[in-house]
Swiss-Prot record:
Its main location: plastid. This is Photosystem II protein D1. The record marks 190 as: Stabilizes free radical intermediate. The keyword Cell membrane does not apply. Photosystem II (PSII) is a light-driven water:plastoquinone oxidoreductase that uses light energy to abstract electrons from H(2)O, generating O(2) and a proton gradient subsequently used for ATP formation. It consists of a core antenna complex that captures photons, and an electron transfer chain that converts photonic excitation into a charge separation. The D1/D2 (PsbA/PsbD) reaction center heterodimer binds P680, the primary electron donor of PSII as well as several subsequent electron acceptors. The gene is psbA. The lineage of its organism: Eukaryota, Rhodophyta, Bangiophyceae, Bangiales, Bangiaceae. NCBIfam families: psbA. The keyword Calcium applies. It comes from Porphyra purpurea (Red seaweed).
Amino acid sequence: MTATLQRRESASLWERFCSWITSTENRLYIGWFGVLMIPTLLTATSVFIIAFVAAPPVDIDGIREPVAGSLLYGNNIISGAVIPSSAAIGIHFYPIWEAASLDEWLYNGGPYQLVVLHFLTGVACYIGREWELSYRLGMRPWISVAFTAPVAAAAAVFLVYPIGQGSFSDGMPLGISGTFNFMLVFQAEHNILMHPFHQLGVAGVFGGSLFSAMHGSLVTSSLIRETSENESANYAYKFGQEEETYNIVAAHGYFGRLIFQYASFNNSRSLHFFLGLWPVVGIWLTALSVSTMAFNLNGFNFNQSVVDSQGRVINTWADIINRANLGMEVMHERNAHNFPLDLASGESLPVALTAPAVNG
């Protein structure tokens, strides 16, 4: 009888735990996806902060020339980064227990893999948590669908691209200047500016910004006045009110006359679906462009494609881009020190001022 009561008590405790995890009454919804999301994101955040502040230099190119990325090794907020794992590791899974020592793990950039893999797991669980909360509240699932766009973009630069290129050292560094360096090298090696999916992604991001500004300004300009001139129009809105707070007919009429009639939505639901769809599809396409270029399916190359009747090349914008790509690729060459010695991190070495005599 005692054993039966203990089983019931433990089952009851488990049921209470399940109801707490899935309760929509909590201040922050946890959910079953949150059970995995919380520890993975906390781990990624903690290791990122520690590595950004104090990680020793990493041999990113596998040529015994470590690159310092942390604040304690001379960087600032702009130049600092968590340096990607060494090219000597490639795309091998490199947890702490695979290294001979902690020093070796740090030297080969182990923290980068730890941060990236935990981060991607965490944000994937965040998608699931959004869907889970929407499901329990009886909402439609489009919030989680929209969030797949930035997650796909992150997965493209942190996971798919390194896999395609054969090494985590080709992944995007976790820092500001490291991100810019990644973008310049990506352009030099893959001509991303001439990739149609990336061009559509640019249209998605900038178009989404334009549509957001247009929508916000139209709504703000057509608010239904319910306050005096001496009060803010915002005071007229009450959270949860049923009546419209702006005149969609006026906004539709204004925009239809400003451009043309059919450029303006007369359905608020289809309008907001479009506002969500446009940037999401654009970022999906950008992630797809990076994922295809990861396997060297690069942007279009129209270099020296325009010639006159004598066969002489007529330079176009494509040739200018090609020249810039070559310059960026040369500057990125491993073990080629293009910068002055006072910008280098190591000690300056003496240089011979006279050429040696060559007999013969």
